[in-house]
Amino acid sequence: LNPKKKENNGVKNGDREKQHETGNTIFRGSPDKYLTEQGWMAQSDLGSRALVEDLVRYKLCQRSLVPEPSGAASCALHSAMRAAGDEFEERFRQAFSEISTQIHVTPGTAYARFAEVAGSLFQGGVNWGRIVAFFVFGAALCAESVNKEMSPLLPRIQDWMVTYLETNLRDWIQSNGGWNGFLTLYGDGAIEEARRQREGNWASLKTVLTGAVALGALMTVGALFASK
């Protein structure tokens, strides 16, 4: 007797697209796009991943590296992270641009670059401002990968960002109100209001971060990007 064929859930036999089941949810596509560790997926991971993917796409769109997405506008949390990232880049545009242009990344060195910068950025502790800097740096690394025709690195870099958030920063984020805590400080147009009042946004929102801290953390690892 021929063995009974298994239901393929609509995926053709010749299709290389794989299905990956986690709980009651089936994800279709490359496992790298959804999971960083087998069997590891929680609601908080999905929130962090969505936030990472939105900020990266937003920054790539700003650089005209990808087309503007169609559909609904981003949620309040995504809008707040976008505004915070823009404010960070605006305040430290020249120095940050110099750092970004020095990034020399290859598929073989990308993770080492990412890990060393992230480790240095949070060496002095964690706060929301440094988390914003982390997002901006990750997006810059993605942009550099696209510029160097290494677009396949994009899902990998985003995976690294999510993994770092959900392992190294998870406890701090949860103890500070989760992403709702971030939204309380940065949401509802808080950054735009601070800019209109000509206040230092990072100080007015009482993040621990200052320009010197954020920029200094990135500048201290500038040599990592300058290596040929």
Swiss-Prot record:
Keywords: Apoptosis, Membrane, Transmembrane, Transmembrane helix. Pfam families: Bcl-2, BH4. GO terms for biological process: extrinsic apoptotic signaling pathway in absence of ligand; intrinsic apoptotic signaling pathway in response to DNA damage; positive regulation of apoptotic process; release of cytochrome c from mitochondria. PROSITE patterns: BCL2_FAMILY (PS50062), BH1 (PS01080), BH2 (PS01258). GO terms for cellular component: mitochondrial outer membrane. One of its GO terms (molecular function) is BH domain binding. It is found in: Membrane. It is a single-pass membrane protein. The chain crosses the membrane at residues 207-227. A motif (BH1) lies at residues 120-139. Residues 1-21 have a biased composition (Basic and acidic residues). Could be the homolog of mammalian Bcl-W. Belongs to the Bcl-2 family. This is Apoptosis regulator R1.
